[in-house]
Amino acid sequence: MPTPIPGPPGVPLLGNIFDVNPAETWNSLNKLAKQYGPIFKINALGHQIVFIGNVKLLAEITDEKRFRKCVTGPVVEIRYTVNDSLFTAYDDEKSWGIAHRIMAPHATKEATEQVFNDIAEVIPDLTKKWSASPKQRIKASDDLDVILIASCMKSFFNQRVDYIANPTERKKGLECVNAFQSATMEALKRPTRPGFLNLLYKPRFSSWTSTLRNFSKEVIKSRKNTPDQSRKDMLDALLNGVDPETQQKLKESQVIDEIITIFIGAATAANLLTYAVYYLSKNPEELKKGAAEIDSVVGDGPIDLSHLNQLHYVEAILRETFRLSATAPGFNIEPIPSDSKAPVLLGGGEYEIPHNQPMIAILNAVNRDPEVFEYPEEFKPEQVLGEKWDNLPAAAKKGFGNGKRECFGKLWAWQWSFFTLASIIKETTFELENPNYELFANGAFSIKPLDMFVLFSPRK
């Protein structure tokens, strides 16, 4: 007999809507995972959702022979902004395959390495500011948000914009960041709101969507009006590429969808670096180890692509930050539809779910599985270094999602994060303005530390 899946009791008709704060959805879910364990369920206005919070069960539900990505809830809501893009397309929509085949050649390891120099050109905008003078008070997340946008603009669209030092461009960059953060947060809240409230919020949702679509239109306009920008890059593929299977091209509206999707997806990398600054500020010995490794491998010159393969400890810092932060906090899974309506068994028959049950992986809990990590709550890069990283179960490394619907740009995101972190450590020293700052993070499709100010100085 299967074990009942635990969960908070809830109230009649409304279910568990009071157990999840819509303004802090992921913080609420993380607390429930700690309280109820590796699998639990809630009822939201009559809809049951099951949550997965350990490595063993995540390994089971990421088996693509049995389960697939579930496009539901907030992911459906953000289709208002990006329609049937790579991130939001339903499993049976042909548009996903067309866009994926057109874009995929520009997301390979080789293509990612080819744009390394673009990243290396942009990141000094950030490190020059942060190392300009001692004890500069900076909200790190703002600068990382816009340097991420600048890096996307150069890597994918061959457009060089200074969002750090140019006040006019910085304002545009921050408006774009605010729009996609606000739109995704609105998408997160809409499924659990009464319909009349969603109508009241619709004008704001429309405004943020318009900001993003207009920003993306300017990217396209700039390419068309500036022949010097032309090259065989992601934007060229979006505008001119032909799907080898269907011979179809993307409409301009679809190009806009994918440009916005790139920005929304890439935001995880900027948020990861904000967390890295936090954890290294709290763990100065690990920061010293990373700096010593960079000095040994790189010396006084610039960091190049070949150096990254030798910066093992710095990469472990990044991995450990990714583990603890779970900055892409979860992903949706459901059983693959079949003619059978029989319940689906999990955990070797220990649990039973309906045949069409949506599930959400809570990576904050998965990544702290005490059965896998010796120090689940502590920042210890050594536990994800070298063979220890290699020997971890695959389900303990799902920060970018799973299978064919995992993060499309994960190679670029990791290269950007790795190089940017190494550059920050090489060029600056830093500490939290408030040594007693307590980590508070929030977000929708990606989360980051809020209200965190850092004192940056040049590294001697």
Name each region found by the language model.
Residues A361-K388:
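Conserved cytochrome P450 K-helix/beta-meander segment immediately N-terminal to the heme-binding cysteine loop
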Residues V71-E77, E113-L273:
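Cytochrome P450 heme-thiolate monooxygenase catalytic core
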Residues L148, C152, L212, S216-K217, ...:
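Central I-helix of cytochrome P450 enzymes
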Residues P284-E286, L392-P393, K410-P449:
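Cytochrome P450 heme-binding "Cys pocket" and the immediately downstream C-terminal segment
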Residues I17-K31, Q35-G37, N214, E218, ...:
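Conserved cytochrome P450 K-helix E-x-x-R motif and the immediately C-terminal K′/meander segment
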Residues M1-V82, K94, I98, E113, ...:
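N-terminal membrane-proximal hinge/A-helix region immediately C-terminal to the signal-anchor transmembrane segment
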Residues T3-L13, A120, K171-A179, Q229-A237, ...:
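Cytochrome P450 I-helix active-site segment
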Residues F445-K460:
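C-terminal helix/juxtamembrane-tail motif
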